[in-house]
């Protein structure tokens, strides 16, 4: 067997604290974060490395993220920041070691094995679907492992999946609309792969509820195709007024018990909304919410119902209040990944303590989190656009919050 050069010592990575000037009003400031070490070694070629005996094995939580991949580094950094924000509030927890010197497409399994050899008691990651698929193909997963994406697989006993699949939001929308006694749905979808996934998930859930899909519209950017689509003739419109002073009889009436589901991004939702009757119930996913900074632009979305995570819609929700926000401004998409990191840390603590059965559902910052067939599924909360701002339509719940299990505290 070829000899392998000894690994250089891990390099300490200093976390960035939350500052009073940058933190949102009411948000707690992060206490000093635990030391994070990032395994760095020469890697001239992307190939699996043999695992050698490690004389400095230290029990830790391994965080596998593609921080140096130009395509995923921004997302990985947001997840890491949220994960470490949660870790900073648990001084009794295991230290976190970040692993980023790998390619999720080629050698994520080798990096996973290296983390185990280095003493990882639990692993969080990988992040991409390809990386998760590669790990899911492994027959043996020796420690509790939380992959940050979902794939169709029959995983080993210790492997669990947790991500932000938009499909789940589409199913939640179907349930919300059904509870409003809406029985007919018109689906407007663009041709992007994500839009098609949203459409399929919504229609599947809607049909399982015994409700009707009355029309599907492929939207290609021309809103004029929507003219008159959601109305039926009003027979009273053809009758003459009793007196000249009578108010005019409307020409059209909105089809009763009908809703619209927008399987689109925010730009197309803005194009479509003016062509829909104001009182026609209209629903979408978090794809249409990019934050409340631009209320003037958001006016185009007034009246649209959607779902998103408490982290963005319920700032007074107890779990949201507990955790510090990023010291640097983040986009709405980055905030969602930051929140994913927070809940990932909370879930891995439950996995380490073997308390999943008694601790779920978790009142997470990403939503209510439950476990089904090795997949942590989250239920988003409902929101609506009003006066150019998105706001929650559900009051925050106040359950007792156990951030971290006492069973996992390190004893002096």
Language-model features, listed with the residues they occupy:
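Extracellular/periplasmic periplasmic-binding protein-like sensory domains
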Residues: 273-342, 356
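Extracellular/periplasmic bilobed ligand-binding domains
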Residues: 137-141, 184, 197-306
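Signal peptide-proximal N-terminal region
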Residues: 79-98
């Amino acid at each position: 067997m070829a000899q392998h050069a000894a690994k250089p010592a891990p390099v300490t990575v200093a976390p960035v604290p939350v500052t009073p000037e940058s933190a949102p009003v009411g948000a707690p400031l992060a206490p000093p974060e635990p030391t994070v070490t990032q395994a760095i070694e020469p890697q001239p070629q992307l190939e699996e490395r043999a695992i050698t005996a490690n004389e400095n094995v230290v029990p830790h939580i391994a965080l596998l993220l593609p921080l140096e991949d130009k395509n995923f580094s921004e997302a990985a950094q947001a997840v890491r920041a949220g994960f470490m924000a949660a870790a900073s509030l648990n001084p009794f927890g295991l230290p976190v070691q970040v692993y980023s010197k790998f390619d999720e497409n080629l050698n994520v399994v080798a990096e996973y094995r290296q983390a185990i050899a280095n003493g990882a008691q639990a692993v969080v990651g990988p992040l991409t679907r390809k990386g998760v698929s590669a790990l899911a193909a492994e027959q043996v997963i020796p420690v509790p492992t939380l992959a940050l994406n979902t794939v169709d697989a029959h995983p080993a006993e210790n492997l669990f999946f947790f991500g932000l699949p938009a499909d789940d939001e589409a199913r939640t929308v179907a349930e919300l609309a059904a509870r409003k006694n809406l029985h007919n749905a018109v689906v407007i979808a663009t041709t992007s792969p994500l839009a098609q996934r949203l459409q399929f998930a919504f229609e599947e859930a809607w049909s399982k509820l015994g409700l009707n899909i009355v029309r599907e519209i492929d939207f290609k950017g021309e809103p004029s195709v929507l003219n008159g689509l959601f109305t039926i003739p009003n027979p009273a419109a053809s009758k003459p007024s009793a007196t000249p002073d009578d108010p005019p009889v409307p020409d059209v009436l909105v089809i009763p018990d009908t809703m619209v589901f927008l399987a689109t991004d925010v730009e197309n939702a803005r194009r479509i909304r003016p062509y829909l009757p104001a009182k026609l119930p209209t629903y979408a996913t978090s794809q249409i919410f990019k934050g409340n900074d631009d209320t003037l632009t958001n006016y185009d979305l007034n009246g649209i119902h959607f779902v998103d995570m408490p982290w963005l819609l319920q700032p007074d929700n107890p779990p949201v209040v507990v955790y510090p926000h990023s010291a640097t401004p983040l986009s709405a998409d980055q905030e969602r990944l930051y929140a994913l990191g927070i809940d990932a840390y909370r879930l891995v603590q439950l996995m380490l303590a073997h308390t999943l059965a008694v601790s779920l559902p978790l009142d997470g910052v990403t939503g209510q989190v439950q476990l089904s067939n090795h997949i942590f599924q989250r239920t988003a909360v409902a929101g609506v656009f009003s006066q150019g701002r998105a706001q929650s339509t559900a009051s925050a719940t106040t359950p007792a919050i156990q951030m971290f299990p006492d069973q996992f505290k390190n004893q002096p």
